[in-house]
Amino acid sequence: MYFKRYLQLAKPGIIFGNLITLTGGFLLATHREIGFEYLPLFVYVMIGVALMIAAGCVFNNIYDKDIDSSMTRTQNRPLVTGDISVIQATIYGTILLILSCLVLYYLVNLLTLWIIIIGFIVYVGIYTVSKRLTIHATVLGGISGAIPPVAGYTAVVNILDYNALALFLILFFWQIPHSYAIAMLYIDDYKKVKLPMLPIVKGIAYTKKIMLFYLALFVVSCALPAVLGSADLFSFIVCMLVALFWMYKSIQSYRTDTDRVFAKTVFKFSIIVITAICLTMG
């Protein structure tokens, strides 16, 4: 029972999603090779990053305890129900953070550790706080969400270059329509706790246009690894096809469907698209 609640506090769904994008960066650096040579490093960076993301989610839960208690989809979180106390959660998050730093420092490399720490600081220290204050919090949160593929890449090459920037941009531009789709789907919850989400402050119609704008930027960014010469033809074709398909389905839904169906369409295909891109990167 307690193990399940502690696992829930770490938000395993978010961890899993970020590890998929990390895999994309790792595969780009190794040209889709995870054989005996790279397997130990792949396992180490996956563990280290998973621990850091888990720590970030725990501290996010602590800070958001008050608003989580008022939203339907978060009312059963462990801190809200009292299954785990704030002190216990703080200790838990700190242990996860320390373990992550040790794994990444000793088993991966210092650059990757610093990159992941930056992601942690942006997520916990900037995004978590700013989402109560500004409509731009989602964009700020996109910075931390774009870190894992960069970490997967630097775990192998131990440098920051244009390929790392390309990975960052792909994930950053992907996250905005993905996140705004979630905001549209749970707009009533966000209204309850008075969070200044873009659909609430600027309206649904404006938000949908912004989503399509960032989706277009995402499509363009998907060509960058191939343009830079780091991704092969197969990867380029897959990336462009799925990105364009997402764009097509979103525009089609924008023209014909209700706001809620549009949000569901964007969200559903965002998961399929980023998974396909990351697992064929290289």
Swiss-Prot record:
Q: Which chain regions cross the lipid bilayer? A: 9-29, 39-59, 79-99, 102-122, 139-159, 165-185, 210-230, 231-251, 261-281
- Extract the InterPro entries matched here: Protohaem_IX_farnesylTrfase (IPR006369), UbiA_prenyltransferase (IPR000537), UbiA_prenylTrfase_CS (IPR030470), UbiA_sf (IPR044878)
The EC number on file is 2.5.1.141
Q: Which chemical reaction does it catalyze?
A: heme b + (2E,6E)-farnesyl diphosphate + H2O = Fe(II)-heme o + diphosphate
Which CDD domains does the record associate with it? PT_UbiA_Cox10 (cd13957)
Q: Which top EC class is named for this enzyme in its record? A: transferase
Entry's PROSITE patterns?
Answer: UBIA
The membrane topology of this protein is: Multi-pass membrane protein
Q: Does the keyword Cytoplasm apply?
A: no
Q: Where in the cell is it found?
A: Cell inner membrane
Family under the similarity heading: Belongs to the UbiA prenyltransferase family. Protoheme IX farnesyltransferase subfamily.
The entry's protein name is Protoheme IX farnesyltransferase
Its gene is: cyoE
